[in-house]
Every structure is written in C-alpha cells, then in structure tokens.
Curated annotation (Swiss-Prot):
Induction: By dehydration and salt stress. Residues 64-86 are annotated as: Disordered. Pfam families: zf-A20, zf-AN1. Signal peptide: none annotated. May be involved in environmental stress response. It comes from Oryza sativa subsp. japonica (Rice). Coiled coil: none annotated. A zinc finger (A20-type) spans 10-44. Zn(2+) 3 binds at residues 103, 105, 119, 121. Zn(2+) 2 binds at residues 89, 92, 110, 113. This is Zinc finger A20 and AN1 domain-containing stress-associated protein 2. Zn(2+) 1 binds at residues 16, 20, 32, 35.
C-alpha cells in the first residue's frame, strides 16, 4: 500500500468549458470556479427577477365606501424633528458622528440633548405609557348577576 502513489485521479486537468483559459473540474460541470460562479449567480437572479416583476404587477384596490377601514393597520409616518442628516444634532447642530442618539420623536441628538427634557420633544411619553398599560392589562369585567 503506497500512500504517496495513490491519488484521486491521474487524468490531466481539462480546460474550462467556456474557453476562458483556466482549468475546469468535474464537480463544477467542466467550468472553472469563476465561470461556475457566474452561471450560478445568473441562474439564481433569473427567478428573483421574475418574482419582482410579479410583485409590481399586483394592483391594490381601495376599500369600498361601506366597509370601515382599520386605521391601526397603517401607522402614520413618524413626525420629523428637522433632522435631515444623522450626523448632526437637531437641537444645536453639533456633529454627532457615530454617537448620535435617536429619540422616539425621530430626530438625532448629541449627548447633551439626548434626553426629552433637554430638547423640544414632540413625543407623547405619557400617552404611549397609558396605551402600553391598557394593552398589557385588558379590563376584566365579570358577568352580570341576575337579580331574583
């Protein structure tokens, strides 16, 4: 048993099936690694392109007038506090870089203005807390007792 003389294949390497000049392998259907990767990517992108075109063809119909529309299904867009770029504080204009703090009102602030009492925050913390408590603890009412 000679371990050194035993090899996987004694056949000479075959050139790439696309003719790019590199050697192909039987595992990659006779293609080199670069050509194989390109064919796999093109095959993978073709179905996704068809799926995207199918998504764009769908038409959204408005709800009939007699049917009530659930307002909670589509949340309103968050109000902007004037922060057009995330790299500047909305209150003082200082460059915040990577340390910007995003408030619940949607603006980005520096370390000095990150708290709601330090900037003119339009977010209703009290109302949000009230809603969270109402959602977490629904009102439990007992059945009415019939009087005799």
């Amino acid at each position: 048993m000679e371990q050194g003389s035993e090899r996987q294949d004694e056949r000479p390497p075959l050139p790439c099936a696309n003719g790019c000049g590199f050697f192909g392998s039987a595992d990659t259907r006779g293609l080199c690694s670069k050509c194989y990767r390109q064919t796999v990517m093109s095959q993978a992108s073709a179905p996704s392109a068809a799926a995207q075109s199918a998504e764009h063809d769908q038409v959204v119909l408005p709800a009939p007038e007699g049917v009530p529309v659930d307002e909670g299904a589509m949340p309103p867009p968050p109000p902007r506090h004037g922060a057009k770029t995330k790299s500047r504080c909305a209150a003082c204009g200082r460059s915040v870089g990577l340390m910007g703090f995003e408030c619940r009102c949607g603006a980005v602030f520096c370390g000095a203005h990150r708290y709601s009492d330090r900037h003119d925050c339009g977010y209703d913390y009290r109302g949000a807390g009230r809603d969270a408590i109402a959602r977490a603890n629904p009102v439990v009412r007992p059945d009415k007792v019939e009087k005799l």
